[in-house]
Regions:
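Feature activates predominantly on carbohydrate-active enzymes
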Residues: 1-175, 189, 196
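C-terminal active-site-proximal or functional interface alpha/beta core segments in diverse enzymes
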Residues: 189-191, 197-206
Length: 206
């Protein structure tokens, strides 16, 4: 019998670094369906661009979706000096989710946090420890600037964003990243240090 061995059969697509149009995403889903894959992990945000419309925070896409330039290969001082961007409206998200469902594919969105957030910080610099200025990254690597957990507005922002995301995706799973979050800003941020003391933690690592 032609039956899958694994219940979770997924593929990942990073549209934060390299934007894919709606039609390109649908072709990707078609290829997944041919191979009977059923989970589409959609990496929608990163330092290099914010790709999902959040109505409560419009500058995430008007500002955070566009980087001024992109590094060429891994030549650290060589950039193309060409603005690059793109994002999906909420209607486009719904269209893609429905298209995937018609092919027995569940879409699992990823909003990467608390690191990999330069695109959001560029749009809303008050969410960072230093207050900026920040810039949507045009290079690779791991940025020191991340969300500031020492202020309540950061958590309000995350709750608002995730509320809208949950409303767009019927998936039982939402990916929130959690990777590569340097703590150098937290070490020097008075608000973060106050939060550490308030929670009774040993240090920035808990």
């Amino acid at each position: 019998a032609d039956a899958p061995r694994f219940a979770y059969r997924g593929m990942h697509l990073d549209v934060a670094r390299h934007f894919f149009s709606v039609e390109e995403v649908k072709r990707y889903l078609d290829v997944m369906a041919i191979h009977k894959l059923n989970r589409f992990h959609w990496h929608l945000t990163d330092d290099q661009g914010w790709r999902i419309e959040i109505k409560k925070y419009p500058e995430l896409t008007t500002v955070g979706s566009i980087r001024k330039k992109t590094m060429i290969r891994k030549e650290w001082d060589n950039y193309d000096n060409t603005p690059y961007g793109g994002y999906y409206t909420q209607d486009e998200i719904r269209d893609i989710v429905a298209y995937a469902a018609d092919r027995a594919i569940t879409v699992i969105p990823e909003i990467d946090l608390p690191g990999h957030m330069l695109s959001a910080l560029t749009a809303y610099p008050e969410l960072g420890c230093t207050g900026g200025p920040y810039e949507v990254w045009g290079r690779w690597g791991v940025a020191d600037d991340v969300l500031c957990p020492g202020q309540e507005k950061t958590f309000e922002f995350l709750e608002d964003v995730l509320d809208e995301v949950v409303g767009l995706f019927p998936s039982e799973l939402i990916h929130i990243g959690g990777d590569e979050c340097p703590k150098v800003r937290w070490e020097k941020c008075p608000r973060c240090q106050a939060r550490i003391r308030q929670l009774g933690l040993r240090d920035k690592d808990g």
